[in-house]
Amino acid sequence: MKPLSEAHKEFIEHLKSKKRTTSTILAYGKDIEQLINDLTERKKANVAEVTAEDIRNFLLKLEKNGYTHKSLSRKLNATKTFFRFLKIQEYITDDPASLVEHPKFDTKPPRILSPTEYRALRDAARDDVRIAAIIEVLLQTGIR
């Protein structure tokens, strides 16, 4: 059986070998570290001991601590990638993360500028023709 901490180190090395960005490696590393800390509190030391219920409980704990559904979804992405890696490496036979669904979250429509904000933005760029042209394109096309 593979200890969680050892699997975590191998996963980070795997991400580096796949040329993932530094920010991805850091984010996934911290997310998996957070998961492992939670699993350790639950007396889970090896990758084969982790269940889908453990992962769900981890996400519920984070939600109770104020994490948004979007943040939980990102952490679940890291977890799913980690467990896919473990399965490919044959450290586990079943992937418990594949049984966990992403939390639903609402996407808010973009905020529309008020007429005053619209005028202020145009006035701020009045002295620079290039910036004024860029702002006009943004304002007239609705590009975000």
Protein language model features and the residues they cover:
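Conserved catalytic core of the tyrosine transesterase superfamily
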Residues: M1-R144
